């Protein structure tokens, strides 16, 4: 989703949350495609705490969210904190939970919060997008992704070594 400001897991399946609950696969499948308010730290008493909205996507391993900040001062401040990597945790507020023991098997997500520390260890921002005027001005930053960097000289050396080994094998 290109017009979002960030994305990440709102909640991940099969992880023990801080409150002892475990979200199970498809527990929030009814929320797929739904847009919910993006709130600062689950603050439901102050309308200024609404800092944007999030589009939810049910996946096999949890619920993924595409977040967009609003243009309020609070939204701009939260956007800056996320872009700088200062705040990365996400947390859902859900109602109508159905549980079997500690397993959550169904629920209705009412909001997604940007929090300092979330209950679900897999719920965090993993991608940030900075919008520019032109498409070329866009910046994508990914967190916690394994990125391998190779210097072109290393690849040339590797090709040369492979060629030499092939030549040696022909001579034998």
Q: What residue ranges belong to the model's regions?
A:
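Short conserved beta-strand and strand-loop elements enriched in small hydrophobics
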Residues: 34-45, 90
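Short, surface-exposed beta-strand-loop junctions and turns on beta-sheet-rich folds
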Residues: 23-24, 45, 71-73
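Short Gly/aromatic-enriched secondary-structure transition segments
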Residues: 19-31
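Residue microenvironments linked to proteolytic maturation
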Residues: 3-8, 14-17, 37, 53-151
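Active-site loop/turn microenvironments that scaffold catalytic and metal-binding pockets
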Residues: 31, 43-49, 56-61
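Short, Lys/Arg-enriched N-terminal segments with co-localized hydrophobic residues
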Residues: 166-170
